[in-house]
Amino acid sequence: MINLKKNIKFLITLFILLELSFHSNFVYAAGSSGDDGDGGKDKVSLYKSGKKLVLRAKKFEKKDKIEKAKKLYLKAYDKFEKAYAKDKKNADILNYLGYTLRKTGNFEKAETYYLKGLKLDSGHLGINEYLGELYVQTGRIELAKERLEVLSGCKCEEYEELKELIEEN
């Protein structure tokens, strides 16, 4: 009886170890991206790197360090551009491409990215807000109001911020 218990215990332990080994190898294989010409970075890590740069740029912007902020926005743009090359159907990436360009003053190109994003997701909150902000910045208030109308059903932060900006102008 003791021998049987030891054998069962051994088999259970062996089974658990094999399972753990299998899962860790599977996770490792699933997580590796290989070399894709950008130091092995996939679209997700490029996107996350870009977002981190945007957050840093916003901090400099709040401190009125505009030139430093612009440099970071341009670095972020490069990350998002590489991510977009790998995923042309991602409205979030297009939103950030437009955002970073708008923040550096390239309104025309920013608008093209926002419009591409709206073709993928016409209700995208960020794109509608930021495109509305771009329209305000370029003196096209009526177009900004159209973006506000799209956001009106959500009663969200994006709606409130765009509404306030339009009212100020």
Q: What residues fall within each predicted segment?
A:
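Residue-level recognition of tetratricopeptide repeat
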Residues: D42, N90, H124, C156-Y159
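Structural marker of alpha-solenoid helical repeat scaffolds
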Residues: K86, L120, L151-C154
